[in-house]
Regions:
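Long, low-complexity or tandemly repetitive, helically biased scaffold regions used
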Residues: 34, 42, 46, 56-106
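Long, compositionally biased, intrinsically disordered segments
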Residues: 1-17, 21, 67-77, 130-152
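Short, solvent-exposed segments of well-ordered alpha helices
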Residues: 6-13, 41-52, 72, 108
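Short amphipathic alpha-helical heptad-repeat segments
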Residues: 4-32, 54, 74-93
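Amphipathic coiled-coil alpha-helices
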Residues: 15, 22, 29, 44, ...
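Extended non-catalytic scaffold regions that mediate assembly and binding
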Residues: 1-4, 25-43, 92-98, 137-147
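Amphipathic alpha-helical binding modules
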Residues: 86-148
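Amphipathic alpha-helical coiled-coil segments
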Residues: 48-72, 110-130
């Protein structure tokens, strides 16, 4: 993706913050896990699983945006991600029905993560839809000039 598009740069800034937050949580949780695995597994394993899942999704989005040709492509990528998660949440299985309890818990945690991803992807879509600050300033200046030109 070419640099210089305020909307994409702003979205990537927030995306990178989310990636860094999840990666930091993974490092911290992994350290706790290595210190006392049994206690960690009982109290914090879900958090580590979710951080790994979210970090992976964010990084896939980052790669897709980095390879995008233009703003329309980035917009489509974000919208496709929203649609994918919403489809999984609305039309997918609520229960995994596996004989493995851990697999069932992992499935449930993925659904929770997808709910958060929909919120995050919508935030990104809102950023992409915003008018860049310099354009806002120009529009405000143009409106002010027009008001001055109009007779009272």
């Amino acid at each position: 993706m070419e640099q210089g598009n305020w909307n994409v740069d702003e979205m990537l800034h927030w995306l990178d913050m989310k990636i860094n937050r999840e990666d930091r949580n993974i490092r911290e949780q992994s350290k706790k896990m290595n210190e006392n695995f049994l206690h960690f597994f009982e109290w914090n394993a879900e958090s580590l699983y979710k951080s790994h899942f979210m970090s992976g999704c964010y990084k896939i989005l980052r790669q897709a945006v980095d390879g995008a040709k233009g703003m329309d492509t980035v917009w489509n990528i974000v919208e496709d991600n929203i649609a994918y998660c919403e489809n999984k949440l609305l039309n997918g299985q609520v229960d995994c029905n596996s004989s493995s309890r851990t697999t069932n818990v992992a499935h449930f945690l993925k659904l929770e993560c997808m709910q958060q991803l929909v919120r995050d992807y919508r935030e990104f879509a809102n950023i992409l839809a915003q008018t860049p600050p310099e354009e806002n300033l120009q529009q405000t200046a143009n409106k002010t000039e027009k008001k001055r030109e109009e007779p009272p």
